[in-house]
Amino acid sequence: CLRSGYQADEGTQLGAVINSTQRSRILSAQRETIMRGGQPILDGGTADVAGREGYYIKPAIYRATPDLNCNPAEVFHAFATICPVTDTEQALQLANSTPYGLGASVWTKDISRGVELAKRFRDGTCQVNCHNTIAYGLPYAGQGISGGPGAGVNCEETFTDYTELKAIYVADYPDS
């Protein structure tokens, strides 16, 4: 299980969230998932870190059926809902039915099949047999309401979306 703690401490895998507003959003999503029928595997909640102030939260994993719509919001934390499916088509339909599309992962022994499936996900980044791997030189953005076009400033192409060119020439000030 992921270890919550102070981010500079060795062994910490999950640091504090940025502020109380984000903590409230995450805890609210955890409660809503249970209200919608999600069964806790790891129940989440707040975490106490001895001697440290901060907004620490435990990881949360829930089991649900696809019809429960247990992903009420995009939660940026160690939060997952596991929905068993009967086949690949159902998995793709479930993944592509949300308004979110930041990233997806396909885990398989058959790399060719994994790449074919990755092409069918509606997201900005899809990875096969890895997750959250970002390479410089490739854009990192989402689809739908996740991230938005050009959201990931990770290469020259996306960096220029946020800049305006300007040249300033300076000569030595002439002596009087």
Predicted regions and their residues:
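Conserved C-terminal structural/oligomerization subdomain of aldehyde/semialdehyde dehydrogenase
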Residues: 56-176
